Amino acid sequence: MNTVRVTFLLVFVLAVSLGQADKDENRMEMQEKTEQGKSYLDFAENLLLQKLEELEAKLLEEDSEESRNSRQKRCIGEGVPCDENDPRCCSGLVCLKPTLHGIWYKSYYCYRK
């Protein structure tokens, strides 16, 4: 019975002493991994930031193209039917209801101001 106790005590002492050494090693390993993890996070953050900047540049480029193409390309000349809600009469013309001619075709025409 004494040999069992001595053996158990010896195994217990070895486990405690080796466990503490492992604890210190584990602490150092965890610290190294944490530092590596921070560098990985910084790398991933920079990569994500670059992708977002590229997307933003593309979106701004598309907006500038739209603004260049957004001007009115064609306009309606004098005496041509127009839409009251969306008048596309040329500059110097106004979309008005006709007085005599054309009252039976459409309700609005482009006239000089």
Curated annotation (Swiss-Prot):
Pfam families per the UniProt record, alphabetical: Toxin_22 (PF08092)
S-S pairs: C75-C90, C82-C95, C89-C110
Cellular compartments annotated: Secreted
Gene Ontology MF terms: sodium channel inhibitor activity; toxin activity
Tissue specificity annotation: Expressed by the venom gland.
Family, as annotated: Belongs to the neurotoxin 14 (magi-1) family. 01 (HNTX-16) subfamily.
Name this polypeptide is given: U11-theraphotoxin-Hhn1f
Organism from which the protein derives: Cyriopagopus hainanus (Chinese bird spider)
